[in-house]
């Protein structure tokens, strides 16, 4: 049984009903509909912390989905799961792949910046200030891209860029 039919959350049920109606009225292929169902079930599992199930659904959605824009969101969500699991190298790979298909994902740039900033802080704790600065510089570049796409968002990142004199 698809996850969308067993979820007990009222908002999720409402979203599922709306999504099902849209799938019926918008002209799409059966493959696109099936891909969306897997994507939606992946999001549901992910929101409940069932990352293994979410990944299975996302991988199946990737197999079926042909639209690069839609694939970018699947890849982004896979990146989120790897970030949550502390698998930062894998997460960065998926964020890059998402941005290759859709360069207008500020949230991917932000998450990449957060990972780079975290790695910079790790380098400081290990006493390697040169490596830390390189990670911080990379974080700054990603945050600048996120801010350029959505001015007014990422206020903390914007302040960090100003404080560290990395904002141009």
Curated annotation (Swiss-Prot):
Q: Which UniProt keywords apply?
A: Chloroplast, Membrane, Photosynthesis, Plastid, Repeat, Thylakoid, TPR repeat
Q: How does it sit in the membrane?
A: Peripheral membrane protein
UniProt xrefs under Pfam families: TPR_1
Superkingdom, taxonomy of origin: Eukaryota
Q: Which InterPro entries match?
A: PSI_Ycf3_assembly (IPR022818), TPR-like_helical_dom_sf (IPR011990), TPR_rpt (IPR019734), Ycf3/AcsC/BcsC/TPR_MFPF (IPR051685)
Q: Where in the cell is it found?
A: Plastid, Chloroplast thylakoid membrane
Q: Where does this protein chiefly localize?
A: plastid
Could you tell me the Gene Ontology terms of the biological process aspect for this record?
photosynthesis
Q: Which SUPFAM superfamilies match?
A: TPR-like
Record GO cellular component, one term: chloroplast thylakoid membrane
Matching entries from SMART domains are given as: TPR
Q: Where are the TPR repeats?
A: 35-68, 72-105, 120-153
Q: Which family does it belong to?
A: Belongs to the Ycf3 family.
- What role is this protein assigned? Essential for the assembly of the photosystem I (PSI) complex. May act as a chaperone-like factor to guide the assembly of the PSI subunits.
Name the UniProt record assigns to this protein: Photosystem I assembly protein Ycf3
